[in-house]
Amino acid sequence: MNPDEFVTTLNNQSLPISNRKMVLFQTYLEFLLEYSKKVNLTAIKEPKDIWLKHFYDSLTPLLYLPDMNKKASLIDIGSGAGFPGVPLKIVNQKFQLTLLDSLQKRIAFLDQLIDKLNLKNVETVHGRAEDFAHNLNYREKYDFAIARAVSNTNTLLELLLPFVKVGGKIILMKTVHVESEIYGASKALEELGGRVSQSFSFELPNDDPRVLITIDKISSTKKRYPRKAGVPEKSPIGGKHD
């Protein structure tokens, strides 16, 4: 995907991208490639792949979830090089955005990126979700929590739901369909205060499969969750489901 295809494809999906926003995306791409020469931030190095697999892919929640186009608070868990949080912020600058990552080298990149793009109302946090979800400045404070991760769904539920206020949503961005994981999530959802809302299956323009799953926060998460760092990954609530 090249920049023209990026704009045309999104415009055809009723998500117009202004010239000013395209300048920000181009700056982002160039800075990511330059920074990656000294710090490995992404396995995706080709510009055409970054436009598709990072930028376009990050914006897919805006195509399927109308509430994501409004003013809202959003936390991106395990943001890495800024995906999906920074592309979402570029397009919807009404977001109050928090980017959380456990590696300082990624936070250093994100701090410089935010400054370079002159993005407002963006906070970076160096740490683990298991720790910061117990911090009252972050716990149940967000309208949305999002993750583009390969972790088991039950693990992600435990990491994300504690950040979201009752009435908010978490958004899981998956590369394959996860019926068995959702089917096996009932115990985790009950413990954590969530309820499956919607699931969208679609393909990127290159035919790669994607799934968006939204979970409504219907009650406060029990105080003991999330458990200590590493435990949600090793021993998900309700077990692992293939």
From Swiss-Prot:
Q: Where does S-adenosyl-L-methionine bind?
A: G78, F83, A129, E130, R148
Report the enzyme's class at the first EC level: transferase
Name the coiled-coil region(s): none
Q: Could you tell me the EC number(s) of this protein?
A: 2.1.1.-
Keywords annotated in UniProt: Cytoplasm, Methyltransferase, rRNA processing, S-adenosyl-L-methionine, Transferase
Q: Where in the cell is it found?
A: Cytoplasm
Q: Which GO terms describe its molecular function?
A: rRNA (guanine-N7-)-methyltransferase activity
Record flagged with keyword Disulfide bond:
no
**What's one Pfam family here?**
GidB
Which domain of life does the UniProt lineage start with? Answer: Bacteria
Q: Which InterPro entries match?
A: rRNA_ssu_MeTfrase_G (IPR003682), SAM-dependent_MTases_sf (IPR029063)
Q: What is this protein's record name?
A: Ribosomal RNA small subunit methyltransferase G
Query: Where is this protein primarily located?
Result: cytoplasm
In residue numbers, the region (Disordered) covers: 221-242
Listed HAMAP family:
16SrRNA_methyltr_G (MF_00074)
What family classification does the UniProt entry report for this protein?
Answer: Belongs to the methyltransferase superfamily. RNA methyltransferase RsmG family.
- Name its species: Oenococcus oeni (strain ATCC BAA-331 / PSU-1)
Q: Which GO terms describe its cellular component?
A: cytosol
Role this protein plays: Specifically methylates the N7 position of a guanine in 16S rRNA.
- Entry keyword annotation includes Methyltransferase: yes
